[in-house]
Amino acid sequence: MHRRQIVLSIFLAALFVMASFPAVAQHDTSPLIGVMWNDVDRKILTKSIDKDEAVELLKQYEKPVKAFFRKMGGNEVRRNKWVFPLTNYSSISYRDEGNDFLLGDYDYFQGSNTKGHPAHDIMINDANKDLLDDSTGKPVDVVSMGSGVVVSVDTTWQPGSKLRGGKFVKIFDVTNSGIFYYSHLSKIFVYPGLIVNAGQKIGEVGRTGRKTILPGGKTHLHIGFLRSENGYPVPEEFIDDLRRSELKVK
């Protein structure tokens, strides 16, 4: 069975579970919990769910996500062991030398029209914007900084879409109780409910996104970490973690 068929089967099963047993998410320890989280996250992006309901659901989903990860033997990784999120690159640079984290009036539940820039942009060496490293002629891989469960993915983005982040992946870091957000990807190799370990490839750097695709946009990874405060994702500055992990690959 192809990956797309597997994902579709899991998704349809999740819809049945949610319709028949809405409270099961509190106890589920299967990949379905990732699919269910993805469904809520999609509704948050499109503002088709009440904020209070969304907050409560994310809070409920955390425990079973952690239980599923540990049941399946996921590799727990402490923060000081996080892995730099890019591999197979010749050189990189940080937007504004790493001073681009701006919280502003950001709120996770603003949907796709979030304000501020509570994350960091890592540019790759791609002057001609063909999505390939100018020195190697190959794509730059995006890998998971920590270990956890994929809880939200978008592979449907097309030019003209209003989705600000383009193609993205969100992974709930079980050990550090937070969500990693990787966006503007050109390709994605994971799906909701999948367990990923630190250093595992999840995608390739790209220029997808409402503004990034424009002529002035640069090929880069937009990455954020949102700590869970009782289920509420709160952005956290982590440039020191990025620089520390980068040193490990030099």
Describe every region a protein language model picked out.
Residues 162-171, 194-250:
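Conserved, short, structured surface segments that act as functional micro-motifs
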Residues 9-19:
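Bacterial N-terminal signal peptides
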Residues 136-139, 143-186, 216-220:
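Zn2+-dependent peptidoglycan hydrolase active-site motif and core
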Residues 24-141, 241-250:
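Polar/charged, compositionally biased leader and regulatory segments
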Residues 1-10:
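Bacterial N-terminal signal peptides that target proteins for export
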Residues 126, 154, 175, 186-189, ...:
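A generic structural motif
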